[in-house]
Regions:
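Surface-exposed acidic, glycine-flexible loop patches that form ligand/cofactor-binding
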Residues: 77-85
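Sequence/fold signature of self-assembling virion shell proteins
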Residues: 25-78, 90, 98-231
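Polar-ligand-bearing catalytic/cofactor-coordination segments
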Residues: 93
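Short, glycine/acidic-rich hinge or "gate" loops at secondary-structure transitions
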Residues: 1-20
Length: 231
């Protein structure tokens, strides 16, 4: 979450200390490019967000419109590539539980039922992006996760916020370090105690990265919104 969010955030359940700027020494987190950050409500920046700038369907509308219209031309910006599921373009948006709460409470009963109907319709598909989803809105499959990056220093420094992640295809990439045999994992077996016990060891070197091109994030947008604990 920190890698694709581009920030450590304030999550107490992350392993790294809150003051950390890198998961691995010498490999600092890369901040999100400014052109790929959307702010909920009337906010236009981190420092002018207020508690009422909550996550809503309008936040998703902004992200979809941005994904469909920006890039792909002489500006050198790469347009977000959607996932292609059964011939239909789809995106995935990962929200924090607090953002889900705000979206539910700001959405009319009919709207939320329509979102959930879409999830029910897609349950018959075999593609895993629909498994466990909250629903679908404008081709965006919604999922929640309590590890989505949160903050507590927005606005004047006292607004709790969360960073939803809107993703197309290959929003994150993985690279493996492999031995000469070209395999991603090493596997070794050794008998011990006069062949009464079999010891097995495996190892791999893998890294995850949010792709960028010319300093711009590729295939993902983040949506920052106020997100206070609702209880």
């Amino acid at each position: 979450f920190m890698n694709i969010s581009g920030a450590r955030g304030s999550n107490a359940d992350y392993i790294l200390p809150t003051a950390s700027t890198a998961a691995i020494e010498g490999q600092s987190l890369v901040a999100r490019s400014s052109g790929n950050i959307i702010y909920a409500g009337s906010a236009t920046a981190k420092n002018n967000m207020i508690a009422d700038d909550k996550f809503s369907l309008t936040s998703i509308d902004k992200a979809v419109t941005k994904a469909e219209t920006e890039g792909g031309g002489s500006d050198g910006v790469i347009r977000i590539t959607p996932l292609r599921i059964d011939g239909v373009d789809k995106y995935v948006c990962l929200v924090h539980n607090y953002q889900e709460h705000d979206m539910r409470t700001s959405t009319t009963t009919g709207q939320w039922l329509d979102i959930q109907k879409a999830a029910t319709t897609n349950n018959g598909t075999k593609n895993p992006i629909f498994t466990g989803s909250l629903g679908e809105y404008r081709g965006v499959v919604l999922h929640k996760h309590n590890k989505v990056t949160r903050f507590k220093d927005y606005g004047a420094g006292n607004v709790a916020a969360a960073r939803a992640i809107f993703m197309g295809r290959q929003a994150m990439v993985a690279a493996f370090g492999s031995p000469a045999n070209g395999l991603r994992f090493d596997w070794a077996e050794e008998w011990k105690d006069y062949k009464n016990r079999l010891g097995i060891a495996t190892k791999c070197i893998v890294g995850l990265k949010r792709p960028q091109f010319n300093g711009n994030d590729v295939n993902s947008i983040v949506i920052d919104s106020a997100a206070a604990q609702p209880y």
